[in-house]
From Swiss-Prot:
PANTHER family: PROPHAGE TAIL FIBER ASSEMBLY PROTEIN HOMOLOG TFAE-RELATED (PTHR34413:SF2), PROPHAGE TAIL FIBER ASSEMBLY PROTEIN HOMOLOG TFAE-RELATED-RELATED (PTHR34413). It comes from the Bacteria. Belongs to the tfa family. This is Tail fiber assembly protein homolog. InterPro entries: Phage_T4_Gp38_tail_assem, TFA_Chaperone. Keywords: Plasmid. The gene is T.
């Protein structure tokens, strides 16, 4: 079959086949080439052109220029993950173009990393504060658990009932354990040696 012949307005003045290069109507990204049959008086399909794009380049997408007059290469980082240099939060890139401002492709190693302009550095003060806070939470949880373990003994004491020797031993053991917890210097967190609770059971 003969090739189509077009006028200056890209309307066929002779019917036939023609190769067109299609691009997305939204972001103008090159999609594919196709052979189209044009009858006389018919133009090329929407979002297509006659000039071929250049060859593929790694890391780039091929887009039709904004004025639709040529092809251009645009950075393509879609699918990559970048990290906010302000918060360290990850973000997956879903659009064409350069990396977003105030991001880096380098992942922070800890929740306490701060960006120094070139790399992540650990904010040791924030890291230590978090460790101390976690230790305080753990200590209170251990104290609460210990207190729960002697709640029945405390109830008997409040009722004026006499404790058995085993109950007295358990009560003193738990109170000693709580004293050890309260005496801990948590400012050295996370390098702490937690006391072990003596497992004695009242009978």
């Amino acid at each position: 079959m003969d090739n189509a012949i077009l006028n200056s307005e890209l309307i066929a003045i002779q019917a036939g086949n023609i190769i067109v290069y299609n691009y997305d109507g939204g972001n103008r990204e090159y999609i594919s080439a196709s052979t189209e049959y044009l009858a006389v008086g018919v133009g090329i399909p929407a979002n297509s052109c006659l000039d071929a794009p250049g060859s593929h380049k790694a890391g780039y997408a091929i887009l039709r220029s904004e004025d639709l007059s040529s092809w251009e290469y645009v950075p393509d980082h879609r699918g990559e993950t970048v990290y906010s240099i302000d918060t360290g939060n990850p973000e997956e890139i879903t659009v064409l173009g350069d990396y977003p401002e105030n991001t880096t492709t380098i992942a922070p190693l800890t929740p306490y990393d701060k960006w120094d302009g070139e790399k992540w550095v650990v904010d040791t003060e924030a890291q230590h504060s978090a460790a101390v806070e976690a230790a305080e939470t753990k200590r209170q949880s251990l104290i609460d658990t210990a207190m729960d373990s002697i709640s029945l003994i405390q109830l008997k004491l409040r009722a004026g009932r006499k404790l058995t020797q085993a109950e007295t031993t358990q009560l003193n053991s738990v109170l000693d354990y709580i004293d050890e917890l309260n005496a801990m210097d948590l400012t050295t967190a996370p390098d702490l040696n937690w006391p072990e609770k003596q497992l004695s059971t009242a009978s």
